[in-house]
Amino acid sequence: MKRDTKQQIVQEVAEKISQAQGIYLTEFQGLTVEKMSELRGEFRKAGVEYRVVKNTLIRKALQDMAGADKLAPALKSTTAIAFGIDDPVAPAKVIKKFSKANDQLKFKMAAIDGAVYGADQLTLLSEMLSKTENIGRTAGLINNVIGSVPMVVNAVMRNMVCALDQIAKQKQ
């Protein structure tokens, strides 16, 4: 590979890293071309970019990232990097699901908003709610609160009317 090509790859990967909310390093040794294509398709469906890059080029691209030194030990063997641009946990869900059926795919490490997660924390990451799920839950909670406010106001007014009615009856 020519030096210009390597520099371009480093620049592209560094740009993706800066845009991504979460990056995931995986080992894919032993996956067939067919399985690798299937995996890329699953990532594409989830809105995740998945790319095979040489470890030395990933290391150079990570230089400006916080916590890059913690990711360095994972840069051994074959490495592919998944970029969670819009949703930091989408890659974890795909990796978890795909690795159940394919033992050759191994999760190495992830970095989300500066925090680094090891290979043993894939289950934790995959069970986290996605951004859209969190937005949906928050909207539901707000909707419930807004819906219950008129009932509370009506109950207070009803109680006040009852209290005034009782006072009026006592004075008669």
Curated annotation (Swiss-Prot):
Per UniProt, the keywords (alphabetical) are: Ribonucleoprotein, Ribosomal protein, RNA-binding, rRNA-binding
Q: Which GO terms describe its cellular component?
A: large ribosomal subunit
Q: Does the keyword Ribosomal protein apply?
A: yes
Q: InterPro entries attached here? A: Ribosomal_uL10, Ribosomal_uL10-like_sf, Ribosomal_uL10_bac, Ribosomal_uL10_bac_type, Ribosomal_uL10_CS_bac
Q: What is the lineage of its organism?
A: Bacteria, Pseudomonadati, Chlorobiota, Chlorobiia, Chlorobiales
Query: Which Gene3D superfamilies is this protein grouped with?
Result: 3.30.70.1730, 6.10.250.290
Q: What does this protein do?
A: Forms part of the ribosomal stalk, playing a central role in the interaction of the ribosome with GTP-bound translation factors.
BP GO annotations? translation
Q: Which HAMAP family match?
A: Ribosomal_uL10 (MF_00362)
GO MF: large ribosomal subunit rRNA binding; structural constituent of ribosome
Query: To which species is this protein native?
Result: Chlorobium chlorochromatii (strain CaD3)
The identity of this protein, by name, is Large ribosomal subunit protein uL10
Question: Assembly and partners?
Answer: Part of the ribosomal stalk of the 50S ribosomal subunit. The N-terminus interacts with L11 and the large rRNA to form the base of the stalk. The C-terminus forms an elongated spine to which L12 dimers bind in a sequential fashion forming a multimeric L10(L12)X complex.
- Indicate whether rRNA-binding appears among the record's keywords: yes
Name of encoding gene:
rplJ
What family does the entry list?
Belongs to the universal ribosomal protein uL10 family.
